[in-house]
Amino acid sequence: MEQRQYSEELITELQKNARVEVINGVEELVKPVPGQKGETRLDIVDPHVKTIIQKKMSEGIGSKPFSLNFDRNRPENITYDLTTSEVSEEEQLVEVDHDHYVDTFVFKAEHANKANPILVYFHGGAFMTGKIEEFGKQMKYIAEQAQATVIFPQYRLAPENPYPAAINDAMGIIKWASENHELLGSNSEKLVLAGDSAGSGLINSCIVLMKDTSIIARAVELYPAIDNDMKPYYDWSKFDVCPEDEQYAKNRVCRMLNSIDNFEKNYLHYKIDPRDEVVDFFNVRDWSKIPPITFILNQYDLITLVAEEFIKKAL
């Protein structure tokens, strides 16, 4: 069994110091960086994250030209198995739209509670990267902690398979999981959808396109893809950061700013208006059909500013 690369005391401190604050007009549950002192908003870069940023900056990562092969095979994308009980893993080929299959992995906790809904997780990676080798151990841990079945589909990736391939795969997997919920270990045909970044974007597309169904019980979105044009939201003054950490905090935000233009070319492939609600959740029209959504946001991230504006619009 692999060991944690950090002290569990850090997790305890995160929970202990959690507090509710109003940030940029939005009430948020804030979990300060362990070691953070005082009651002000987060103003230091997590020392563990800063070490990673420093390494990437020294290697020039982020300043080099875009390379799909490099992004798909990043050497630092390593995860650790933190489970302490048995979690089964089964690979299935799920037919979608009667013309292709999606390689799908099903993780089931040893003592999964059938009363718990199935969780379907859509990985991030700018719609162009992501694979089971990066996310599998995380899925095992989620299944164990939730005592539920977790489904991880390897949906088709751009630019080889641009819009709407990934969305069609996502909807196909959602329907399959709901229709086969009993075989998959749940008494509920309703599902919880979870995902990070681009994976959250797929969830939002499915929410719009499947609004007349009742399959989606809840969504949990980590640093969610909400608005395709994030540049208008950029305002560095909204980030509170100590001067000695500013270059590291800005590094992440600026890297994201520089990658926005690739979205329409590589994923949408100019097949749909980038402002259409199907691919831009900020422009959703029917708010009455949106299920409960939980956003989990990063400390220094352009997406955080977009999400805060979306929440204010929703309220």
Model-derived features: positions:
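Alpha/beta-hydrolase superfamily serine-hydrolase fold, recognizing
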Residues: 2-22, 29-30, 36, 41, ...
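A domain-start/cap signature at the N-terminus of enzymes
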Residues: 77-92
